[in-house]
């Protein structure tokens, strides 16, 4: 299996998995044009589309792709049923694509119906988990998002986190504002800054490393707890997550 990223809009990534036979899976095609160009350039045969949630920058290209390749099966949560989804999937169900079984994980928060797809080592997490951050809460609550990213953080160490946006640099600037002396965060920030200066992608990331540099995954970390306690005493990891999300919204 080969993992490919296709840039779209200002900072989106459309992920494509292809096998040796050229069959491919497309994840969150917000725009059809760059996907069609990549399909033509690589001689891929699209087999399926995965949708994580209903936002236009993730579903906008579905209808054009299905029109061009009517054999495509479009998997998605209930909230994408009017966006071209032909196979609605929900938590704990599986999608069998390219000879691999993908587990569906419900991750409400960014939207109420948001889902992720996992087949070792690939995690397609849409706008739930970003490198160094997590998605904004357009529909869900901090409690829901905390539980969602906790699920994702429990996946195997070698999981490849395939986020849908290039937000890593801004996320790491926020992380530094919270834990300015953290060695892992500082090292990763420098690496990301160099990559972005060359207009290079920072994704995917390895989950084991992400747990070290993503403050939203470190709500039980004593260094973070001490920082938060300087401002307010919060007893539960869930409360500390909500504090971080509120700070990030205003950053």
Swiss-Prot record:
Its EC number is 3.1.2.6. Gene3D superfamilies: Ribonuclease Z/Hydroxyacylglutathione hydrolase-like. It catalyses: an S-(2-hydroxyacyl)glutathione + H2O = a 2-hydroxy carboxylate + glutathione + H(+). It is an enzyme of class 3 (hydrolase). Binds 2 Zn(2+) ions per subunit. SUPFAM superfamilies: Metallo-hydrolase/oxidoreductase. One of its GO terms (molecular function) is hydroxyacylglutathione hydrolase activity. Pathway: Secondary metabolite metabolism; methylglyoxal degradation; (R)-lactate from methylglyoxal: step 2/2. Zn(2+) 1 binds at residues 53, 55, 110, 127. Its cofactor is Zn(2+). InterPro entries: Clx_II_MBL (IPR035680), Glyoxalase_II_hydrolase (IPR050110), HAGH_C (IPR032282), Hydroxyacylglutathione_Hdrlase (IPR017782), Metallo-B-lactamas (IPR001279), RibonucZ/Hydroxyglut_hydro (IPR036866). SMART domains: Lactamase_B (SM00849). PANTHER family: HYDROXYACYLGLUTATHIONE HYDROLASE, HYDROXYACYLGLUTATHIONE HYDROLASE GLOB. Monomer. Belongs to the metallo-beta-lactamase superfamily. Glyoxalase II family. This is Hydroxyacylglutathione hydrolase. The gene is gloB.
